[in-house]
Amino acid sequence: MSGKTLTRMDLSEAVFREVGLSRNESSELVERVLQLMSDALVDGEQVKVSSFGTFSVRSKTARVGRNPKTGEEVPISPRRVLTFRPSHLMKDRVAAGNRS
């Protein structure tokens, strides 16, 4: 593992190099795509990127949890959580990278 993190700037730079848009246009394109994805998730829609995976929002009901330090029961409120399910192609690709 390299420990490197792919950032918005890295994505913009890749669009700039690969597509040929200006740096400004590349940055705006990346921001717009991320905004569309975020908006869809906030609205409860799934975001499916072929050969990559599916982002979705799951609703979790209220439940009783436990404080691990004290053992005391604490209520956990209902909430929405973001989930990502990688595609089989992505899983295979990551697994193949583990072998090298």
From Swiss-Prot:
It holds the Pfam family Bac_DNA_binding. HAMAP family: IHF_alpha. This is Integration host factor subunit alpha. This protein is one of the two subunits of integration host factor, a specific DNA-binding protein that functions in genetic recombination as well as in transcriptional and translational control. Heterodimer of an alpha and a beta chain. The lineage of its organism: Bacteria, Pseudomonadati, Pseudomonadota, Alphaproteobacteria, Rhodobacterales. Keywords: DNA recombination, DNA-binding, Transcription, Transcription regulation, Translation regulation. GO terms for molecular function: DNA binding; structural constituent of chromatin. PROSITE patterns: HISTONE_LIKE. GO terms for biological process: DNA recombination; positive regulation of metabolic process; regulation of DNA-templated transcription; regulation of translation. It comes from Jannaschia sp. (strain CCS1). One of its GO terms (cellular component) is cytosol. InterPro entries: Hist_DNA-bd (IPR000119), Histone-like_DNA-bd_CS (IPR020816), IHF-like_DNA-bd_dom_sf (IPR010992), IHF_alpha (IPR005684). It comes from the Bacteria. Belongs to the bacterial histone-like protein family.
